[in-house]
């Protein structure tokens, strides 16, 4: 049975057989095809002549216009169809019920009892809430119920052991505690330490943020750069007395040339380090001392003295070429390493921690320069000599306390660790007026430096006098 479709709309719609509609459509297509076939044949015969006359642009525009007309004719001949369907009540799409978006058909909708569905949805929503409320009620007595002392004793041993169990420590927490303990972060002493760098907080050259790390590095590396305390054994022509004479003379030259204090301590270090590595003849010892001071001046001073100045001071005992040659030999032997922690660096820090006055400063440097002259003081590290010099100066001046917690914190040394070195320094002070090397004693006897060498040595640190034979 042939299908039928309603053409038009409303009450006047007429049913047209589908077979008749197909026949009319085919005839129209044949007529259009014949028309355009004739058109394109004629157009093809004359395209050369028109191309020459009108140009390629106009010809192409005409050709495109013909194609557009053909397409418009095809669109215009299509009839407008309207499908009349039985009137049905409007359907409201339920969520997730029909997502097919069908055009020519309808998806089968499930028959749902809305009251039952709403009740089921409400039950589903209430069940989790009810379950959570029950859990809360079950857990609530464990929080608020307080057991009596008698009930606590009734607990089994496993429960008592679990209650006494220490909290679990992770690897990160253990490593953090070890690191803080090694750096002194959790040390109880640090809470009592006065900030000696507070006054320099606005001074960028003081590097307050790094000063603790710098001096910790100095203390850790000072033994690496220390000269040998037994190098005199390998020297064949010089001895301790000759070294003392040379150092005493260099202190006088340093004072007359008004050089920086750092230059003096670096000069003595260079001499001792070079003598630890090289066997020096007796006649070249002064040349080594002059060349070492020239190197230290170039390293520390803003305006270093000239070579001829040292030649004049040494009474022209050697030539300019000898000084420069020895200077090069020393630098090569030391591998050009002049950045070392000297005694002077530690003294500056320890005096700051001592919170003393100018007199304490002069007395400390007096003991430090006495230590420079004596070869036997090489047995002690520079940081130990610096701390012992501060301790001996406080003992000599009668300051109290002799050694504070602040000094112990910044030096890392307790009072018993300083006694041996401090006793040697005070003994040198007691013997200075009668010693042959009196430059240091006379230098610090001047009022300009507080005449600190004229103070009586600390009797507390002097050895007891030997009994007088009857």
Swiss-Prot record:
GO biological process, one term: cell division
UniProt keyword Magnesium present: no
Pfam families according to UniProt: Cyclin_C, Cyclin_N
Keywords carried by this UniProt record: Cell cycle, Cell division, Cyclin
Gene3D superfamilies membership: Cyclin-like
InterPro entries registered for this protein in UniProt: Cyclin, Cyclin-like_dom, Cyclin-like_sf, Cyclin_A/B-like, Cyclin_C-dom, Cyclin_N
This protein's GO CC annotations: cyclin-dependent protein kinase holoenzyme complex; cytoplasm; nucleus
Name under which the protein is recorded: Cyclin-B1-3
Native source organism of the sequence: Oryza sativa subsp. japonica
Gene, per the UniProt record: CYCB1-3
